Regions:
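N-terminal basic/disordered segments at the start of proteins
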Residues: 2-22
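Generic hydrophobic/aromatic pocket-lining and core-packing "Φ" positions
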Residues: 13, 42, 68-71, 131, ...
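Conserved, mostly hydrophobic/aromatic
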Residues: 16, 142, 190
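Glycine-rich phosphate-binding active-site loops on the catalytic face of alpha/beta enzymes
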Residues: 23-34, 76-90, 141-150, 193-217
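Glycine-rich, positively charged N-terminal anion/phosphate-binding segment
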Residues: 32-49
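Charged helix-capping and loop-helix junction motifs
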Residues: 37-42, 95-100, 124-131, 155-164, ...
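C-terminal helical cap(s) of enzyme catalytic domains, especially alpha/beta-barrels
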Residues: 40-45, 91-102, 203-239
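Conserved anion-binding
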Residues: 51-154, 168-172
Length: 239
């Protein structure tokens, strides 16, 4: 399992790097769950990180093909782009939006579709329906996140349900990532359900998700990611 840390600028990127994050994710928490940073800010983050780690970027929630394509083109060159579908309830429309992002991101940049655990509240597609969209559009992976940040992922969806979703994603040949107000205490559960990547913002910050990324907090989280799995941990005791 790998650790993704969301940063809003080059200063935080340096802290995340120094703390040992595996993926540096460009995101503006003031603009929502998938708030995009400016093209200039993304470029500064990429210069700071260089070749040391992969850089991902949030594109926000998709609304129309022109805007999505422009955002993807501006972020081209990142290792992967995260695209949400808040307000999108049609699989056909989601496919059109995902294809627009994939086309303009370029062949070297992968696309990760973001499903919301609180999908009804976000007026979005259910996570299993978004898996079908990902398969049809050639996405590289799926991230299960929360649109609203007032409850953590495993408070909204049981570990057993997440495990079944992760298994379906991986069976389709895609990578499965988890986020959504996760703390270090959730990492053992994330590992047990089969997640390949965990994404955090608030847990890595001093002062919450709108605070600043702390090198020490990232290092502590990475220690939990790398900790050997507990032989006694199972989904049966987590459910």
């Amino acid at each position: 399992m790998r650790l993704l840390v969301s940063v809003r600028g080059p200063v935080e990127a340096r802290a995340a790097l120094a703390g040992g994050a595996d993926v540096i994710d460009a995101k503006d928490p003031a603009r929502g769950a998938l708030g995009a940073v400016s093209a200039e800010r993304l470029a500064a983050i990429r210069r700071t990180v260089g070749a040391a780690r992969p850089v991902s970027a949030a594109l926000g929630d998709a609304h129309d093909e022109v805007t999505v394509a422009a955002a993807a083109a501006a972020a081209a060159g990142a290792a992967f782009l995260k695209l949400g579908f808040g307000g999108v309830t049609s699989e056909a429309r989601a496919q059109r939006l995902a294809r627009a992002a994939r086309r303009d991101a370029g062949a070297a940049t992968a696309l990760v579709l973001v499903a919301y655990a609180d999908w009804r509240r976000a007026t979005s597609l259910a996570p299993d329906h978004l898996l079908a969209v990902a398969v049809e559009t050639g996405a590289a992976g799926l991230l299960l996140d929360t649109a609203w940040k007032d409850a953590p992922l495993f408070a909204l969806v049981s570990p057993d349900a997440v495990a079944a979703w992760v298994a379906a994603v991986r069976a389709a040949g895609l990578f499965a990532a988890l986020a959504g107000s996760l703390s270090g205490a959730d990492f053992a559960t994330a590992r047990a359900v089969g997640a390949e990547l965990v994404g955090v913002r608030g847990a890595a910050c001093v002062g919450g998700r709108k605070g600043r990324v702390s090198e020490a907090r990232v290092a502590a989280l990475q220690g939990l990611v790398r900790a050997p799995p507990s032989p006694t941990l199972s989904l049966g005791v987590l459910a």
